Amino acid sequence: MFDVTLLILLGLAALGFISHNTTVAVSILVLIIVRVTPLSTFFPWIEKQGLSIGIIILTIGVMAPIASGTLPPSTLIHSFLNWKSLVAIAVGVIVSWLGGRGVTLMGSQPQLVAGLLVGTVLGVALFRGVPVGPLIAAGLVSLIVGKQ
C-alpha cells in the first residue's frame, strides 16, 4: 500500500536537511518513526499536547541562563536602563504576542502548518535565511489573514 502522507513527510524531512534546518528534519523523522511503529497510537495525545509541551521545553531553554546564574541579576536590572535593552524588551513582548496569535491560528487552521514549514525551508534554502519559530510565522500570517 502506498502511503502518500509518509512520502510527504519524507520530502519535508529531506528539505529540512537540504536547508540545514535540522530541527525540522529531526522533528519530522521522529514523527515518521511514530507513524510506522506501534507508537502511532500516541498521535491523538501528541496532537493535543505536543504544542504545549514544546512551548514548555522552549521556555525552559530560554530561562535556563537565569536559573543557572549565567545571566546574573545585575544584567537583568541593567536591561531596564539601556535604550537598546528596552527596544529588545519591546520586541520580545511583540514577538510573544505574535506567537500567541500563531498558536491560535495553527489550532484553528492547521492546514497552514505545511505552508509555514515549506516557506521556512525555502527561505533558509534560497535566501540564506535562518529558521525561525513557526509560531511567530503563524502570528504574522494571522495579521494578514485573520485568526479564524
From Swiss-Prot:
Keywords: Cell membrane, Membrane, Transmembrane, Transmembrane helix. Disulfide bonds: none annotated. It comes from the Bacteria. It is found in: Cell membrane. InterPro entries: UPF0756_TM. It is a multi-pass membrane protein. It holds the Pfam family DUF441. One of its GO terms (cellular component) is plasma membrane. The keyword Transmembrane helix applies. The chain crosses the membrane at residues 14-34, 51-71, 86-106, 121-141. The keyword Transmembrane applies. Belongs to the UPF0756 family. This is UPF0756 membrane protein YeaL. The lineage of its organism: Bacteria, Pseudomonadati, Pseudomonadota, Gammaproteobacteria, Enterobacterales.
